[in-house]
Amino acid sequence: QSSTYRARFPVQLRGATAEFWNSKLCNFVGSGPDLHGAYGFRLRHHFGLDQLVRAYEALSHTPESRQVVLQMWDAGSDLPREDGTPSDPDIPCNVISMPKIRDGKLEWLQIIRSNDLFLGVPHNLVQFTCLQEIMAGWLGVECASYNQISDSLHLYNRDERDVFGSRPLSNVAPNTDSLALPREESEVTFGELERRIEWMITPELREEELERMFRWDAARQAYRNMLAVLVAEAARRRGWTDLETGAMSTCTNSAFKELWIRWVQRMEA
């Protein structure tokens, strides 16, 4: 398989799909269809094995194992050239994940070589705590602590105004959704979610087709909520206001609803 995937763990999204949701992606990972440092591809294909499945199998059989390390960094393709220049614009910032079971719960240590405080940290926290929750579901255990080590944590001058001008949210609604599912159900669910996401970005997609897409009775509510947000955003980008509102009205996650309101306000500002 090619490295065209810009993955979010069990779901793997092609470069074109990711750019639909983030039109500025090429500014950070370079132009072209291939995305060199795609995390999901690295975790599931790059090294010749599915690291997530191997981790699940190892921890299922030997819960006390301290040898499970998920690798995203590949020295052969990620080390700088001899003159110190980057080998590619999209070098993985996250280098390894270390899941381990302690006292019957799944702990997670994430190690990051370089971490943008504004545009990196929030996304990494969401990405890898989600993966921790998904893996815990596969293993049939609860989540324990999540710890993140950033070797080079930095803030760019261009982002200072946004960071220092921000204020903590008050009375934030908790996210009560759980992504934890048994492995087989999880793989089927993410496969269907991936199929729907790929369909959402097709240029010929009609409004009524997108409206049917967010009706997913077979899925758990947490995944229906996730899909509702994606459908709402796909509708917003196409100017289908009624569908955008209708999709979010089906979302039962109060945290998602609050964040959606803030997102729309930001986009309209």
Language-model features: locations:
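Terminal, non-catalytic protein-protein interaction segments that mediate quaternary/complex assembly
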Residues: Q1-A269
